[in-house]
Amino acid sequence: PQKLDRDLRTVAESPQPFDALLQVIAEESRLEILPIDFVGRAIQHPLFSMMRWYLKSRGAVCLTTGMTLRRNMGSKYQLERDHIFPYSKLKEVGYGESNRVKYALAQELTNRAILTQVANRTKSDTHAVDYLTSVKAKFPKALELQCIPDDQNHWKIENYELFLDERRKILANQLNDFLEKITASEETVAPVSLVDLIAEGESDELEFKSTLRWDLK
């Protein structure tokens, strides 16, 4: 409640509330996202909401249907969070619940793609290398738009953690660029009238000169 009251007061009293709120955030924590911030983070983490928002804003498409994610096409096309590397396949190679660290990596948000509901129902547990190869053939730009590494070696299950490392870097870089653009503010310079200059008086940058022209009439 105290932080909320402070933020509301900032909005009400500041001539530039957006910049003022950004300053408050910057003082409390860094605005930069690092690849390590994604490690072991599941879809409940705020970074996933930010990723989803960013992907929709840049025109990302469903990997299976090619439909733009930001279009509302009815209940069958509601957006869902799909494992790129199916959990059933990861579990077979040691990423099950018996190993908490590995399990967290299997559920990491960087192992998620945004698909429409109808696409998610048909994908099942296809190996990532087969699925992503098919996606690249049908929709060449789809992987890039969802910040998915393009190196096919990373799609093999034995290279799963290399895939995570690479996608963390891609997401961190692109989200930072995105945040920088939406948080950048331009300083507005108000025009100064001649009357204001005269009222201000002379200074190091302004000197009044007397004129040699006289109206003798």
Residue locations for each model-derived region?
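Intrinsically disordered, low-complexity N-proximal targeting/linker segments that flank membranes
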Residues: 1-84, 89
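Short beta-strand-alpha-helix junction that forms the catalytic/metal-binding core
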Residues: 79, 91-121
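Active-site-proximal structural scaffolding
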Residues: 44, 74-78, 105-109, 164, ...
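Long, cytosolic, alpha-helical-rich C-terminal regions that act as interaction/scaffolding modules
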Residues: 117-185
